[in-house]
Amino acid sequence: MNLTLKKFQVHPFHLVAPSPWPILVSFSVMSIMLTLVFNMHGFMHNNYWVVFSAIVAIMTMALWFRDIISEATYLGDHTLAVRKGLNIGFILFVVSELFFFIAIFWAFFHSAMAPTIELGGVWPPVGIEAIGPSELPLLNTILLLCSGATLTWSHHALLGGNRFNTLLGLILTIALAVTFMICQYMEYSNAPFTISDGIFGSVFYFGTGFHGLHIIIGIIMLGVSLWRIYTYQLTNNHHVGYETSILYYHFVDVVWLFLYIVFYWWGT
């Protein structure tokens, strides 16, 4: 805790100063969704505004993260009580994400377990050639499981004070996650159906695409953690950002296992 806080503050909590970043991030994310919907429905004939909104969102989030890192690393605002609150808040965030994916699985099971006459009374629907569980989906599963293992290795190395293994494990994790996204892109490019092909295509692409978005976010979070470990900002007893990144990535790993079993194996 810095000298100013010790002199004037009698509680361990961080009183956040006014910041422009939350409202700017909110508006930029809203702009992404609106321009994306308008583009999908033909009201916009290019992706320029979608890309612009995404760039603004990334820039404002980066500036917001910069302020948080400064508060945690240099200003001493993240006391034990604050770190406990951050961990609890992030766990609640992961729970909210869990319910989001539950809704996606619910939509899939609702249609798959009682296919209507419009679908031909079968699942997958008539005319849909589903993607099987072998080849790319199986490779993606192996990649994510390996990345989860290397991430756990990196975390244990950090706890043990082994800086080299910490960085190596984190680099391997990011490389495996990027490879997963490349394979996912290849799968989408060669898929025999699109997001417009009825409920099967809609739920499949929404579920796997939303998971892919979480992988991208996880890569960014792990990349920031890699930079902070490399610059000696995180230690073996103070690395809340890295711990939350690990929790997030393992959650995404588990979600993929359910996606693989339900969408690629049982659902086909």
Swiss-Prot record:
Enzyme Commission number, as recorded: 7.1.1.9
List the catalysed reactions: 4 Fe(II)-[cytochrome c] + O2 + 8 H(+)(in) = 4 Fe(III)-[cytochrome c] + 2 H2O + 4 H(+)(out)
Subcellular localization is given as:
Mitochondrion inner membrane
| Classification via PANTHER family | CYTOCHROME C OXIDASE SUBUNIT 3 (PTHR11403:SF7), CYTOCHROME C OXIDASE SUBUNIT III (PTHR11403)
Describe, as the record does, how this protein assembles with itself and its partners.
Answer: Component of the cytochrome c oxidase (complex IV, CIV), a multisubunit enzyme composed of a catalytic core of 3 subunits and several supernumerary subunits. The complex exists as a monomer or a dimer and forms supercomplexes (SCs) in the inner mitochondrial membrane with ubiquinol-cytochrome c oxidoreductase (cytochrome b-c1 complex, complex III, CIII).
- Name of the top EC class for this enzyme: translocase
- What broad class describes the main subcellular location of this protein? mitochondrion
Q: Which GO biological process annotations does it have? A: mitochondrial electron transport, cytochrome c to oxygen
GO CC, sorted alphabetically, is: mitochondrial inner membrane; mitochondrion
Which CDD domains is this protein grouped with? Cyt_c_Oxidase_III
Q: Membrane topology type, per the record?
A: Multi-pass membrane protein
Which family does the record claim for this protein? Belongs to the cytochrome c oxidase subunit 3 family.
Q: Which organism is it from?
A: Yarrowia lipolytica (strain CLIB 122 / E 150) (Yeast)
Residue ranges crossing the lipid bilayer per the database entry: 23-43, 49-69, 88-108, 141-161, 166-186, 203-223, 246-266
Name of the protein: Cytochrome c oxidase subunit 3
- Keywords, ordered alphabetically: Membrane, Mitochondrion, Mitochondrion inner membrane, Translocase, Transmembrane, Transmembrane helix
This molecule's function is given as:
Component of the cytochrome c oxidase, the last enzyme in the mitochondrial electron transport chain which drives oxidative phosphorylation. The respiratory chain contains 3 multisubunit complexes succinate dehydrogenase (complex II, CII), ubiquinol-cytochrome c oxidoreductase (cytochrome b-c1 complex, complex III, CIII) and cytochrome c oxidase (complex IV, CIV), that cooperate to transfer electrons derived from NADH and succinate to molecular oxygen, creating an electrochemical gradient over the inner membrane that drives transmembrane transport and the ATP synthase.
**A GO term for molecular function:** cytochrome-c oxidase activity
